[in-house]
Amino acid sequence: MTNEDTFSTIDHAINLETGKTIRVWETFPKDNSLVKNNTILIASGFARRMDHFAGLAEYLSSNGFHVIRYDSLHHVGLSSGNINEFSMTIGKKSLLTVIEWLKRRNINKFGLIAASLSARIAYDVANEIDLSFLVTAVGVVNLRDTLERALKYDYLQLPIEELPEDLDFEGHNLGSEIFVTDCFKHQWDTFNSTKNKMKDLNIPFIAFTANDDSWVKQNEVLELIESLNPEKCQLYSLIGSSHDLGENLVVLRNFYQSVTKAAIALDKGSLNLDINIIEPKFEDITSVTVKERRLKHNIESLELA
């Protein structure tokens, strides 16, 4: 655990009965901020580690939020396991484990922010857990279609025995048999399965699409939103952004600003993003990012020792 006085990110380890560990990072609200009602739990997108969301955590904590991030099991990052054994169900179990850990610490009021592939997991559990609100960014609603667009081929049409050993997804080897088998077994693959999981949603929900997103069909996200309670959900677009929310500093800042505004609005029961926020200094974000990378390397070094 790091010194809270000199570094705002606190490292925790959830040790499981299986011998595996889920790593969690915690950031408290800034001292001069108006503390909000809810904690924010961030679920990173596929092939993204929790330290990739240092900037978002800095924005949220500067605006009064207590922020929790984690790395999924069998994923990139600090938690146990290799990404070639990742499945959507493992991602779901990792999220639920972190939520149970929060509840054991008497943190019962929280909103969930999920990006990309993790948003599909969020859609799966939103009706199963006691969330205050949900925010998704470039959230996957049709997993099979997104995989085909990302991989340039519909591998889910192949019999299991004809699949390649690994699927190269964003430079990482995803174990095809494990991932595809899980998709079909637990019905992660279709747009209708997402709609069915979300159909009774009764919490405030804001979704962000990106107008240049080639991996997610905006019309399907709109269809999902239109199937829900119109008084509790709203769709916004991140203009000028692709599926990669970190492709440049302009896009990244827009993402940070928009999601922070959504969290503040939802925390006070609104869907309106016409909100003033406190923007952390660029050098503060850079400093936290560097310190978190150093923390990550120190943890990895200790695990290898």
Swiss-Prot record:
Keywords recorded for this protein, A-Z: Acyltransferase, Luminescence, Transferase
EC number: 2.3.1.-
Functional description taken from the UniProt entry: Acyl transferase is part of the fatty acid reductase system required for aldehyde biosynthesis; it produces fatty acids for the luminescent reaction.
Molecular function GO terms recorded: acyltransferase activity, transferring groups other than amino-acyl groups
Keyword Cell division belongs to the record: no
UniProt cross-references to HAMAP family, sorted A to Z: LuxD (MF_00774)
Gene3D superfamilies the UniProt entry points to: alpha/beta hydrolase
GO biological process terms held by the UniProt record: bioluminescence; fatty acid metabolic process
Active site: 116 (charge relay system), 213 (charge relay system), 243 (charge relay system)
NCBIfam families in alphabetical order: PRK13604.1 (NF010127)
Organism: Shewanella woodyi (strain ATCC 51908 / MS32)
Residue runs in coiled coils: none
Broad class of enzyme this protein falls into: transferase
The protein, known as: Acyl transferase
Record pathway: Lipid metabolism; fatty acid reduction for biolumincescence
Family the UniProt entry places it in: Belongs to the LuxD family.
Cystines in this chain: none
